[in-house]
């Protein structure tokens, strides 16, 4: 029974979700934060300071030493800059751990290294990260230790979107506004918000480790077969076939890591193509689903590294 996983116990254990906020935040602060999340009302700095303090204390209990504004630039993967919670040493040589509401809400990273920055100098390509409070923060554990990841949007000084998240949030707001108008037209006067949902499944090619030595095959960017695959049911690796043990062990590790970070990994099966498999989560609000997609991609890449399963990192 050493491999037993209590899903109810571990699910969302590394996420600063609504349950954690109810337990840790004062009732007034919790109510104000929920209004911001659900109605888009502005969050005062006084409330933000309390939220930041409790988020920091919770993250430290989870083993975090740093925090980062976690955003999705136009590179197709996430970006982040780690800052430790430590402050300047006091006169006695000891340090305090601090995390303010200002640090939670807004950051100012360099945008010159991203596709939107081009060849401009650093001071001319400023980018601002802004906390997306509708997507919960989480603690990620890796070789760097524990990192408090705060989902954010990434914009220019003049408000142009520099990431994938900002247009998504704006489109969600546009859909909400127009959908509510339509509902009112049909006589619905009680609905307060319309939220689009999304499910992003991931396909996993299961190549053998020794094949990774063939860089020429990897650089083609496509699946190669030396002979035509069987057309009928001659083999047992079809869509509903039993998943191979090596892939099952890999998916077990991926599922556990996903559940800890609140990703509802639900379905796993073989794909139609030989040596390909799929892992799919449950539908979630669009912006959260987009974040979960990036979390899943990182977990898939991290877990497939040799010598454990020798699966491709792409």
Model segments located where?
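Histidine/acidic residue-rich metal-binding segments in metalloenzymes
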Residues: 2-15, 19-101, 105-123
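Glycine-rich, acidic/polar active-site loops that bind/position phosphate-bearing ligands
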Residues: 125-313
